[in-house]
Every structure is written in structure tokens, then in C-alpha cells.
């Protein structure tokens, strides 16, 4: 049980770091989000959020 909790916490921390890396694509240059999604998932990248530049999401075209 303890191992399961440690694995879940580790995965949550890793996914949080990944999302923070993706978020920087929109804050620096919105075109970076699109390039990131094209290279990693062959999808279109779209920046969104309260200010329009807080989160990068990949979507199928």
C-alpha cells in the first residue's frame, strides 16, 4: 500500500513538471506551442487560459 501511494505521488509530481514545461510554450511565444505539438504528437497546438497564454494544449486537426 505504501508503495502504491509513493508511485501515485511520484506520477503526480512528474505530470505537474511536464505541464509546467508545456505552459512555458505559450508564455514566451504562442507559436512555440504549435511547434511543440507538431513535433511530439503531430497535432495543432493552441494556447488558452484566462489571458490566452497560460496553457498549451494539443488537438487533432
Curated annotation (Swiss-Prot):
Keywords: Antibiotic, Antimicrobial, Defensin, Disulfide bond, Secreted, Signal. It is found in: Secreted. The keyword GTP-binding does not apply. The keyword Ligase does not apply. Its main location: secreted. Residues 1-19 form the signal peptide. It comes from the Eukaryota. Disulfide bonds join 26-47, 33-56, 37-58. Residues 20-22 form a propeptide. GO terms for biological process: defense response to bacterium. Expressed by the venom gland. Antibacterial protein. Belongs to the invertebrate defensin family. This is Defensin-like peptide TXKs2. It comes from Olivierus martensii (Manchurian scorpion).
Amino acid at each position: 500500500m505504501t508503495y502504491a501511494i509513493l508511485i501515485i505521488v511520484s506520477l503526480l509530481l512528474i505530470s505537474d513538471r511536464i505541464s509546467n514545461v508545456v505552459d512555458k510554450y505559450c508564455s514566451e511565444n504562442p507559436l512555440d506551442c504549435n511547434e511543440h505539438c507538431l513535433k511530439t504528437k503531430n497535432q495543432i497546438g493552441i494556447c488558452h487560459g484566462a489571458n490566452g497564454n497560460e496553457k498549451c494544449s494539443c488537438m487533432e486537426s
